[in-house]
C-alpha cells in the first residue's frame, strides 16, 4: 500500500508540471488544471492505467501541495507572433517520435504535421520583430529549477519540462517597438483544444527575473476561496459549501448585528458575499456609488439630493458625494464582486444609514427640494453590466433617531446593457452607472418634480412595507410611531384618578341593584363612561379592568335577596348564573313564574318539583297543586323535568292535544312523557272534561338549539320556555349563553322579562 501511494505521488509530481497557468482576465474564474496524459506517458515510458478513485485521491493530495507554492505575481497575458511557434513545433515533432506509439492517446504524426504546416504557413505572412519572439521564447522555456512550481511542498526539485513538452501556438498583433504590448500564449495537448492563459505585462517584465507564475487573485482576506487545481468543474459538496459560508466574515458578525438590531444585511451582499474596501475618504458628506466613474471635470457639477416619486429610475446622490474610480489600484471592474458597502460609507454589515444633517433646522422636520436633472444616454454600452437595486434602506431621522428596517431588496443581473441603478434612503431613490468599455459616466436623470415626502405618496400602498410601521413625513413634527404607546395616541383630558372615581360610583350602583357584578358587561361600562365624559375609553380597557377587579375584591360578600310572590333568591342562588354553574330549582321556578305572569291567560308553568312528586306519590301527591287553576283553559303548559344532573322540558299544547319533549342534548325520556299523559287523563276525569280523555299524541322536537357543554342545560330550558310562551323563534345558540345568563340575572333582580 505504501509503494502504491509512493507511485501515485510521483505521478502527481509529473502531472503538476503538465500545465502551470490558469486563465483569469481579471475576473472570478476557477483554476483549471486538467491531466496532461500524453506528456505523462511520454515521461514514464510505459502505459499508465489507474481508475477514477485513484485519480481523485491523487488530485486532492497534489492540490494541497500546489497551493502552498503559489507566489503573488502579475497575471500572464502575452501576445506574440506566429514565428515563435515554428521552433516550438519543430521541437515538438522531435519529442513526439518515440519507439512506443501506444503511449499516446489519440494524436498521430499526421495530425502533428498538419498542425505544424498550418502554423508555418500562417507565420510566413507576418512581418513582426524577432526580438520579442526570442524574449518570449526565453521567458517561457527558461524556468528556474528552484522556482515555486518546480518544488512540491519542500520535496526534491525535479527537472523542469522542456519547450518540447508543451505544444503551444502563439497569437499576436503588430506593435510598435517602443510599445509594451501584451502576449497571448496558448498551450495545447493531444486531447483538448487550446487553453488561453492569464494576462500579464510584456516580456520585459519577466526579463528582469520575474518568474512566469500565475497571479493569486487578491480576494478579501476573509473570503479567500481555496480550490483544488485538479478539480475541473467539480461541484463542491454541500458540507464544504456550508462550512465556508459559516466561516465567512458575514456570518461572524451577523449575530452581533442581530443583537444590536441596527440593521439587516442587504440581499445583494448575501448573494455576492465579497466585500470591497470601504472608501470613506471621498464620501464623507453623502453616499458613494459602487460603480466606477471618472471625476467630473467641472467641480460645480456636484450631484444634489433629489427625491423622486415611486419611479426608481431617478438618480440621487449626496451634496458632497464623490464617485470613486475602481481602476485606481489596477483592479479590474469585474475582478471584484460589487456590494453596497461602497455605495454608503456609513453602512455597517450590509445596512446603509444616512444621517441627515439637523444643524440647519431646530426641529426634526423633512425639507425636500424639487430638482430637475437631465441625463444623456450614452452612445455605447457594455455587454455585461451588474445592476443592484434596493427599494428601502435604513435612514436616521434627525433627533428622533428613528430607524426603519430594510423592506425590500432586489438584485437584477442584466446582459443586454440596461441602466445600472442603486436605490436607497427609505424610498425608491436610485443611483445609475453605465459602463462604456474602459470609462464610466455618472449622470443625473429625471424630470420628475413630485416629492416622495408628500403625504399623498406615502399613503399609497406601494410606499408602505408590511414589515415596518408607516412613516408619516408630511412636513409635520415627527412623532414616535415605533412603539405605538401613549405618545402616538391622543392625550385624554380625563386622568386616571378622575376615571377611577367615576367608575367606582357606577359600580356602587350596580352592586346596590344586582348584589354583584355578575350581570355587568364591558359594553355597559364603556357606555356609561362615554355618557359621563363624552369620550371613548376603549384604549384604556386594561386600566378599567384592573379597577373592576380591585372593586370586586373589596366587596366579596353582600347580603342581597330577591322576593317575588312566594319565591326568594339569595346570592347563592344568583351565583348559579355566573360562569358555567348549574342552575338550581329556585332560579328555574322563579323565572318560570315571571314567564307565566307575562302571559297569564295562555301559559301555565309547573314547578320543577312537580314531576318528581308525581313519580314518587302519584296523582294524589300533586292533586291540590292545580286546585285553583283550570289547566284545560290554557293554551300552553310548561313542565320542567329535573333528573338530578340534567334539565329537560315537556310542553303540552291543549289545542291539538300534543305532548312535546325538548332536550338540549337530544335525549328522549319516554317515561317522562308517559307520566305526563297519564296525569292529563286523570286530571280530565277529575275536572269532568271528557273531550280531553282521548286523542293525545307525543312528539320529540329535534331541530332545536343544542348545548355544547355540560352546564348550560338549565339555561337552554329557560330560553325554550320564554320563546314558546312569547311565541318567538329559537334564535340563540351556545355562543349566546353568557349573554343570556346575564340577562336572566337582571330579569330575576328586576322581577320582569326584558324582552
From Swiss-Prot:
GO terms for cellular component: nucleolus; nucleoplasm; nucleus; postsynaptic cytosol; presynaptic cytosol. Its main location: nucleus. It is an enzyme of class 3 (hydrolase). Transmembrane segments: none annotated. Its EC number is 3.4.22.-. Residues 272-283 have a biased composition (Basic and acidic residues). It is found in: Nucleus, Nucleolus. Residues 268-321 are annotated as: Disordered. Signal peptide: none annotated. GO terms for molecular function: deSUMOylase activity; SUMO-specific endopeptidase activity. Pfam families: Peptidase_C48 (PF02902), SENP3_5_N (PF19722). The active site is at residues 646, 663, 713. Keywords: Cell cycle, Cell division, Hydrolase, Nucleus, Protease, Thiol protease, Ubl conjugation pathway. Belongs to the peptidase C48 family. Interacts with CCAR2. PANTHER family: SENTRIN-SPECIFIC PROTEASE 5, SENTRIN/SUMO-SPECIFIC PROTEASE. This is Sentrin-specific protease 5. It comes from Homo sapiens (Human).
